[in-house]
């Protein structure tokens, strides 16, 4: 399968590309290149057939010719960034994605994997959130996820199959590291300062999922029979990896010798 991965130079994208290539897929990347410098460790980006330097809002039908599937990761990627400039978040994350999908349909791309988020559930009243739970997005980032799911679902037809993966909070190493994610952030503090200072009571829950497990979920979605994934939503995570923030902090502090938790 020939796959276009948008946001390929990001935290998830660079790992996903390697996973897909290892499974025999032909991968082409697309990225703005804003964060091209500052790799945490070396990786062989030269293995890409090509990496297109482009904003998704400017992508053309010509650029999209010849792909079997698109995995869309290229968005403004967290709540604080989304709240800083909500209009830009909507322009890129919502309208940029819808425009991209319209062009995908025009050129005959049959599969589109959209990386949504568990943040669409907001503060849930139920003990656990399932794919059938009603979304209650609290931020511009989460609201855009819900809008994209709604609009893309309406575009599904016999020739176009979108799939929505609501990922839990990612953790784990990547050449393009993110330290704004809760577990990664606490591990960075433990390593660099030897101390984790709790700034709240730590009672909020965080569903976690390893970044490579997200990659595997995406790969399995691409390879699954069409009737299984057509216009479906899947939570990507494991109930056993739901933790309160204070529990995550305790585990991290115990993992790094000499780290103090205050």
Locations of regions flagged by a protein language model:
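N-terminal Rossmann/SDR dinucleotide-binding element
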Residues: 1-69
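Short alpha-helix in the Rossmann-fold core of NAD(P)-dependent oxidoreductases
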Residues: 75, 85, 92-97, 113-116, ...
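Short-chain dehydrogenase/reductase
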Residues: 90, 138-146, 180-181, 207-208
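Conserved Rossmann-fold NAD(P)-dependent oxidoreductase catalytic core, especially the SDR/UDP-sugar
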Residues: 98-140
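Conserved beta-loop-beta element that borders a ligand/cofactor-binding pocket
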Residues: 116-117, 149-174, 184
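Active-site Tyr-X1-5-Lys
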Residues: 123, 138-163, 191-192
């Amino acid at each position: 399968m020939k796959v276009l991965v948008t946001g390929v130079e990001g935290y998830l994208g660079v790992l996903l590309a390697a996973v897909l290539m290892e499974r025999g897929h032909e991968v082409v990347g697309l990225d703005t290149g804003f964060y091209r410098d500052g790799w945490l460790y070396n990786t062989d980006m030269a293995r890409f057939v090509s990496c297109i330097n482009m904003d998704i809002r400017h992508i053309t039908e010509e650029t999209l010719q010849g792909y079997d599937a698109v995995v869309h990761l290229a968005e403004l990627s967290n709540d604080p960034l989304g709240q800083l400039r909500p209009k830009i978040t909507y322009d890129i994350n919502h309208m940029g994605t819808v425009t991209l999908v319209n062009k995908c349909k025009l050129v005959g791309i049959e599969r589109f994997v959209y990386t949504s988020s568990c943040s669409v559930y907001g503060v849930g009243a139920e003990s656990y959130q399932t794919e059938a739970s009603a979304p209650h997005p609290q931020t511009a980032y989460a609201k855009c996820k819900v809008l994209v799911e709604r609009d893309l679902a309406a575009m599904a037809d016999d020739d176009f199959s979108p799939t929505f993966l609501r990922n839990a909070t990612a953790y784990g190493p990547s050449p393009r590291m993110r330290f704004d994610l809760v577990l990664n952030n606490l591990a960075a503090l433990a390593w660099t300062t030897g101390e984790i200072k709790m700034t709240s009571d730590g009672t909020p829950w965080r569903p976690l999922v390893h970044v490579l497990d997200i990659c595997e979920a995406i790969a399995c979605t691409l390879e699954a029979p069409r009737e299984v994934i057509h216009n479906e939503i899947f939570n990507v995570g494991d109930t056993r990896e739901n933790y309160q923030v204070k529990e995550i902090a305790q585990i991290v502090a115990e993992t790094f010798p000499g780290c103090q938790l205050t």
